[in-house]
Amino acid sequence: MYWLGIDLGTSGIKAVVIDETGKVVSMGYAEQNVITPKPGFAEQSPEIWWEVCSRAVQTAVLKGNVNSSEIKAIGFSGQMQGIVMLDSDGNVLRNCIIWMDQRAANEVKDIEKTAFRTGVNTLNITANECLPTFWAPKLLWMKKHEPEIYERIDKILFPKDYLAFRMTGEMAAEVGDASLSFLLDVPNRKWSWEMFDMLDIPRTFVPDRLLESTEIVGELRTDVAREWGLEAGIPVIIGSGDQIANGIGTGIIREDVMGASIGTSAVVFGCSGKPFIDNNKRAIQSLCHGTSDLWCYLGLSLTAGASLKWMRDVIFKDKKLEFERQGKEIYDYITHIASKAETGSGGVLFLPYFNGDSAPNNDSDARACFFGLSLSSSMPELCRSVMEGVAFSLRETIEVCRQTGKTIDTIRVSGGGARSRLWRQIQADIFDASIVTMGVEEGPACGAAIMAAVGSGYFSSVVEGSDAIVRIKDRIEPIRENVKIYNEYFHLYRSLYANLKTSFKERAALIR
């Protein structure tokens, strides 16, 4: 008996087949690119998602020599906050404006003014402060800047829900993804028509069905099943956003467990029995978890793993091509170079703000930079400073959580940043916490498969499914001497943003 988990990421799409023990039987992966038409803009083509998804699923099914009749359900994990706009025939109207896009910063200000004028307490309704990455400001941006497309919108979908629509012909939204629309009543897990009306957004834009993460959106269409080598009629479970799915896939389903994931972005993730509402405007996001009696919270560093990818593509461009020809992994080489630097990278600090910063600074104008370079600075120090800078950005959110009284002494890590032992040690030392990795590396896809198993009736709940499948693999303890060094550098790191904030805004004004 198998379940298929599909993870729609930013850099690519993974399809993972797992069995009832949690063993990954096979995996398929296909890459895709981000389109950046202007500074601060980030888009992807939903049509290309579909092509990439098809390749990933076909690879997983063929590679594992899986009997298609034994795949009992399909579940989703997907990048969050993207908005797919469809016309009345279900055709895509334009590229998806994805989660890292910052174009709607001015619309956030407009929303805040409207809420103040009308007396609507948006924080109590949505459990979030408004961010430019959310649906609501993106829709207002569309109305203002692309009215000819806005007027043709019939339905809007989240990225994973678009794939589910293509697979089943059925449209639905899901409470986890919808939590970051700024249109959901997060405490009550339902659309807030008050928010729609306040912002003059048509209620008809959203699908008629709003589901929990383990509910069935529809059945796999015959033509899709034939193309993918699967059985027609397999139940398709709507799943949830990638961070929620990763939480399920790494066992973050109780209040005393916290996780950190480094992929294209990086996230600190925890859960609670009620929405985590941050009154201090630090962009800590509150969402409905994958089970109806839990909520989760996260702090996002927008371009964390993308920072190392930038190093790969720009600084190590020639080496990348050489390694590709040899069939070797360039990230292992970069990590090896970084390991030659001392703790603290010789005083070189890196701010990972290539496309702005979310938590806790909430600044779309912030940009990446190296600080402390001298003529003696070396490539190992540059590489290590990027890894340290990403960990420092996550520690900022961890400190916000600690200030609320949460005890954080163990963190479950996942994503690309968990594969490097050096990076795990850096995280342990900077977070001053034990770093734990799980037996299944593909957390979001595994979480999607667990939701599929729950939705198809094999497990009675997400908690039961996660407990049955997720296992601890490795633990790294912080090195006390390094913790002391990093505490001092963290103080300097935090001061850099404060001192550069005005300069970031001046720079943004110059290039607009």
Language-model features: where?
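Glycine/Thr-rich phosphate-binding loops that ligate phosphate moieties of nucleotide
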Residues: 1-29, 35-36, 72-114, 148, ...
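Divalent-cation-assisted or electrostatically stabilized phosphate/pyrophosphate-binding catalytic cores
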Residues: 45
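Glycine-rich phosphate-binding/catalytic subdomain of phosphoryl-transfer
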Residues: 41, 55-326, 333
